[in-house]
Amino acid sequence: MNTKSIVFNADNDYVDKLETAIKSICCYNNCLKFYVFNDDIASEWFLMMNKRLKTIQSEIVNVKIVDHVLKKFHLPLKNLSYATFFRYFIPNFVKESRALYLDSDIIVTGSLDYLFDIELDGYALAAVEDSFGDVPSTNFNSGMLLVNVDTWRDEDACSKLLELTNQYHETAYGDQGILNMLFHDRWKRLDRNFNFMVGMDSVAHIEGNHKWYEISELKNGDLPSVIHYTGVKPWEIISNNRFREVWWFYNLLEWSDILLRKDIISRSFEELVYSPKAHTAIFTASCEMEHVEYLIENLPEVHFSILAHTYFASSVVALLRYSNVTIYPCFSPFDYRKILDNLDFYLDINHYKEVDNIVSVVQQLSKPIFTFENTSHDIGNQTNIFSSTEPNKMVEAIRQFIGE
């Protein structure tokens, strides 16, 4: 079987994210040769990784990029590292004719055979366009590059990229801008399935780009082959972009389960860590939710999703100390649909105004609603109403409903 060469840039601060990406690849692929371009990752980490990877006929190469001028180059975002420019050096260190470059904030959900089998048709690389709507883009996203290493090597691409960066780093959009300068008309378009960027999920509706949610919706619940966590990252305390739980699934997988290809690798985050008996939700425009903490504490088998069109007060964010709580500030249409699709019952316990006519929406779904007499937004009184002085009775009713 031919070796699949896969390249990452990384620094020591990102090594846990890098390892999560590698874990996801190893779940579905053998005969891998990872190149990790870095200047500060300890050799002990590579020793342990090579011991693990040997089980699946794979290896990892510690490529140290030293004595470089990259630190002086301007970066478009504060959270980016100069290590992003390390991909320029692919033709100098990768021995194989083809390599797949991946950013470390990526998860792979299946076999990579297709990418290593397709014809590059003489192009210098294959990539996915960097588009955030229905208007085609002439630029590619540099987070996933299928590199024609022979072409890069023959053309001395590394030197050319460094020269262009030296000239234009103040105005170009980082390495991506420079790569597009050099290869602007010499790249093959790939389906977005191979670099599915989710960074717009949580901001498109705020910017009025509602078309995004139609264009980027996946059919039949399928996962993209390559998920790219652009924008807010899934390891941050709050991130409403899609597939957060997918990243955490691979992050928490044990290496022994991956290398032995145990059944768990084909399951989900909930099956791996936490599978609630029921899901509930609260749509609110206020931080005041009647007895919310009491309900959370006394219904540990229920997962609570709290959604708002705005950012949350610190008192709501503090509820994240409970493992059965997720909050959705500035929730998106994707969040809305996901919550309603999973909903078992609704809690109408927020004070002040109702959000998005949610009580009627839930009633149309034929889902039960539990409320207090001082928070009910149901003018028809069709919900299960409890006294705010006896929250224990609501807890008892919910337990009975979910079969506890």
Swiss-Prot record:
Annotated Mn(2+) binding sites: D103, D105, H228
Q: Does the keyword Metal-binding apply?
A: yes
Region called GT8 domain, residue ranges? 1-267
Question: Which domain of life does this protein belong to?
Answer: Bacteria
Supply the CDD domains for this chain. GT8_A4GalT_like
Entry's PANTHER family?
Answer: GLYCOSYLTRANSFERASE 8 DOMAIN-CONTAINING PROTEIN, LIPOPOLYSACCHARIDE 1,3-GALACTOSYLTRANSFERASE
What is this protein's function per UniProt?
Answer: May be involved in the polymorphic O-glycosylation of the serine-rich repeat protein PsrP. Has equal hydrolytic activity against both UDP-galactose and UDP-glucose; no glycosyltransferase activity has been seen with tested substrates.
Family, according to the entry, reads as follows: In the N-terminal section; belongs to the glycosyltransferase 8 family.
Full protein name: Glycosyltransferase GlyB
> What taxonomic ancestry is recorded?
Bacteria, Bacillati, Bacillota, Bacilli, Lactobacillales
Recorded name of the encoding gene: glyB
